[in-house]
């Protein structure tokens, strides 16, 4: 017959071994789950990046869209609410390029003179941005540089500077007026005013002190009457 102590010892050994194996199994399962979660995140992120790359590739490049900005008819598309097809845009772009190439330098000079000399367009001549907008029918690289030169000449003209002199600084005449007014006031009058102000303040302080003393005496009299009663 085996002793009960040996049986209990064997039972404890088996229980300890089972607990250790269960702990190892749970640790392995947890590590496997963590590995799967991390892989899933990586796969999900990769799929997102791939989808974004595909969308970016499907979109047309901005350089191709903005190659000829002067030929895009924004007002027509805005009012009608329909976008033109690519073939129609290409045809219009080629027509605009041919028309722009047909302009000569003399036409450009006449257009600039008309813009500057026309009295109805005087407001646009003073503003360089409006000058560039009024000449939008000419080639972009050529008329932009010419309009900038015209604007520089316009603003650097001495006659225009004489016609529109700069406004004087308002702070200096105001300060001069203040100083001149202060110099006209005599010092005796200033000292008299200061003395009068100090006397008035002293009188006010004396009146307040008298009022407080009267109130204190009245309160003391009332307290004495209550105490006697």
UniProtKB/Swiss-Prot annotation:
One of its GO terms (cellular component) is membrane. It is found in: Membrane. Disulfide bonds: none annotated. Pfam families: DUF4718. The chain crosses the membrane at residues 17-37. Keywords: Membrane, Transmembrane, Transmembrane helix. Its main location: membrane. It is a single-pass membrane protein. InterPro entries: DUF4718 (IPR031695). The keyword Membrane applies. This is Uncharacterized protein C1orf185 homolog. It comes from Bos taurus.
């Amino acid at each position: 017959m085996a002793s009960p102590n040996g049986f209990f010892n064997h039972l404890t050994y088996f229980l300890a071994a089972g607990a250790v194996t269960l702990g190892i199994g749970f640790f392995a399962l947890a590590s496997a789950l963590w590995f799967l979660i991390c892989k899933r995140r990586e796969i999900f992120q990769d799929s997102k990046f791939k989808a974004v790359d595909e969308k970016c590739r499907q979109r047309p490049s901005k350089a191709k869209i903005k190659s000829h900005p002067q030929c895009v008819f924004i007002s027509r598309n805005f009012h009608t609410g329909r976008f033109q097809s690519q073939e129609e845009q290409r045809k219009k772009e080629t027509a605009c390029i041919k028309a722009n190439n047909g302009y000569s330098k003399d036409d450009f000079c006449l257009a600039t003179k008309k813009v500057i000399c026309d009295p109805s367009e005087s407001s646009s001549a003073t503003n360089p941005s409006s000058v560039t907008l009024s000449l939008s029918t000419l080639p972009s690289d050529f008329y932009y540089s010419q309009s900038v030169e015209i604007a520089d000449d316009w603003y650097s003209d001495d006659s225009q500077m004489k016609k529109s002199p700069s406004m004087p600084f308002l702070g200096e005449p105001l300060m001069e007026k203040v100083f001149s007014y202060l110099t006209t006031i005599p010092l005796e009058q200033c000292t008299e005013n200061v003395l009068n102000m100090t006397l008035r303040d002293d009188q006010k302080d004396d009146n307040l002190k008298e009022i407080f003393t009267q109130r204190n005496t009245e309160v003391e009299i009332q307290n004495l009457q209550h105490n006697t009663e």
